[in-house]
Each structure stands twice: as structure tokens, then as C-alpha cells.
Amino acid sequence: MNESKSTLKGKVKRYAKVSSKLTTVSAKIASNKLVGKGDNNKNAELVLNALGGLKGPLMKVAQLLSTVPDLLPKEYSEKLQQLQADAPSMGSFFVKRRMKSELGLNWQKKFKNFDIKAKKAASLGQVHKAKVNNISLASKLQYPDMMSTVDADLKQLKIIFSLYGTWDKTIKTKDIYTELSQRLKEELDYKRELKNMLLYGNILKNEKFINIPKPIKKLSTNRLLTMTWLEGTSLMSWKESNQEIRNHIAKTLFNAWYIPFYKYGIIHGDPHPGNYQVTNEFKKLPSLNLLDFGCIRIFPSSFVGGVIDLYKAIRDNNEELAIKAYKAWGFKNLTKEIINILHIWAT
């Protein structure tokens, strides 16, 4: 079977799987409500299982929705938060087949140990713990046929965006779709992510409370990324810490985000909690592990200047400077009403 036929087959299978899962979930929820069993906990569990099994962009959307305060009912938000770091993983058969595809028939001989059971599963791939020369490693293995999955999901999202555009014409969904499409396809290129990891390691090398894994090139391919293992706990597990610790973690998160942006125009485009860990390797103050570098956006200096101008404009209530900032971002035909709306989003 040639590549185009294989890709088409993958897309058709994806359309069928998405339609089947979402239709089944919708029917069950509707049935529960009809017979007076509108239990949000059970319904949220149905949605979690459906989206977790789908992987790909639709799962990423669910991850994003779970991070927006008050957007979803509490039961749904809590369930979908599990997708940030604990999604369903591939079975051992698929793992072995995928590893053989990436590193060859004798792939296991390249490792001292390789745990077939995933330590973490996400939307586009899953992470396995391994060891080489007594060094602990993390191998991120992409799920099978993800390009077809992404293409199929993007087509469905495009339809949703088009429908939304007929209802609300103030938001240009075409630009959102283009940006989303480009970033998602970049995330499938693990060699690109390897370069991003090296870039962030260099940018943040002087930040003693920020840890960046080191990639292992000889054990990495376009769809397999191997790096040094970083040990830590989830970001949310530290929310009950004392104020000094929480302030320190917040400041470290700020530095991890804004030092690359303000100095180099580089932004981490997928900052959901599952992409961070906190570790207490320092006795008094913990440090932050950055784990994912697939979605990195580089902006021109004019855009960064616009961000700084807007911060000053809002701080000083300077509308003229705010208009200059919005124009630097590409906004045109700015009216008082549009500026007020932009201010709401900016603050």
C-alpha cells in the first residue's frame, strides 16, 4: 500500500473512531438525563474515557479546557485535569512495534533497561523510563499514525470553527485555525523538539531553580525523543505549601516563561500543568522541571516590544501607547469598542 492510500485509510479510521466515541458519549449522557440520572460525576467520567482514548488534538483541547477557571462544571474540570499527566497509554505490543520502527530490530540492546509500561501518556505520545550506562532516561514515543490523526482532527475543528464564525464574526477563526494547525504539525517533529530543548537549556542555563532535560541524539528520531530523566512531583501537589514556597514556585514559573520571551522572543506554547514538575533537590527552596518543548513559538522583536508597551499602557492608563501596542500586533481599524474589548483580554 502506498503512502497516500495509507494516510487516507488512517484518516477514515480516525473519522469513524471520533464519531463513534463522541456519539456514544452524547447518547449516554442524554439517556441519563432523560431517566433522571444526570450525575455530573458519571458523565464527566464518560467524557474523560472518550477523549483520553482518542489522543491527538481533540485531547489537547480537553487539556486546555480543564485549565480555564469556571469554564466547565467542577466535576468535568476535575476529571479532564487527569489528561494533563495521566492519560491512557499504548499497550506493550504497540510499544515494541513502534520502538522497532524507530531504532531497528535490536532496539532493546541499545538500553540497559527499558520499561515497556509508560510512566506518562499524553495527547501525541507517551514517556517510558529507561537506563543507559546507569543514567536514567526518558524516551518519548509518538503514537502510531499521528499525522493522519492530526489531519483528521484539524478538518473536524475547521468545521467547528466555521460554524462558530457564522455565530460570532468578531473573532477570525481562520487565523486561529492556521496557527493551531502549524503548531500541532510542528509538535510531531521530535527532531525539532530536540533542538528546542537545547535552545531552552542554553537560554535558562543560569537559572539555578529551572531544570531542562538533556537530549540523547543517538537514541532519538523524528518520532522518538530520548532525554535525561528528571524526577519531580506535579505542580498542583504543591498548592498547600506555605506562602514562601508558593511564591517561589510562582516566581520560577514566571522566569521560565518570560525570560525566553522578553530576551529572545520565544514562548512555550503549551503551558498546561502536566508539562511542569516541582522537585525539592534544594533543601530550602524547590526547583522547576520543564518537560515538553514541542510547541515553541518565536516572535519578531516588534511583537515583544508591543507586549512591553501594552504593559506600560495598562499600568499608566495610556490609551495612545496601548493603540501603538495593538497595532504592533497587527490589529487594524481600531475603534473605542474594540480597544475596550482588547483591554479586557489583556488584563
Predicted regions and their residues:
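N-terminal accessory/targeting segments that precede structured cores
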Residues: M1-Q126, A130, T149-T173
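ATP-dependent phospho-/nucleotidyl transfer catalytic cores
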Residues: K74, Q81-P88, K100, M147-A152, ...
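Glycine-rich ATP phosphate-binding loop
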Residues: K129, S136-Y143
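Conserved beta3 strand of the Hanks-type protein kinase catalytic N-lobe
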Residues: A130-K131, P271
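A generic structural motif
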Residues: Y143-D145, G294-C295
